[in-house]
Amino acid sequence: MGIEQLSCPACGATFEMGLPRDVTVQSVTTEDREEPDDDRVKVRPNACSNGHECYVMFRF
């Protein structure tokens, strides 16, 4: 597992998220996302240091 540096879409603050190696981050948004039908795409919640909840979508 690797640590990715991501930016909060609400305020631009940088936050870290542990993700499996060799994934591609597709989006970081404040809008709640449901799990896609594609087994190779996942959505995980996270929050920045300012408390903004965001959703990270990534593909294996």
From Swiss-Prot:
MF terms in GO: zinc ion binding
A Pfam short name: Zn_ribbon_Brz
Segments crossing the lipid bilayer: none
Keywords assigned by UniProt, alphabetized: Activator, Metal-binding, Transcription, Transcription regulation, Zinc, Zinc-finger
Coiled-coil intervals, chain numbering: none
InterPro entries, sorted: Brz_Regulator
Record-stated family: Belongs to the Brz family.
Summary of the function given for this chain in its UniProt record: Activates transcription of bacteriorhodopsin (bop) and phytoene synthase (crtB1). May interact with DNA or RNA via the zinc finger motif.
Protein name: Transcriptional regulator Brz
Organism whose genome encodes this protein: Halorhabdus utahensis (strain DSM 12940 / JCM 11049 / AX-2)
Lineage, highest ranks first: Archaea, Methanobacteriati, Methanobacteriota, Stenosarchaea group, Halobacteria
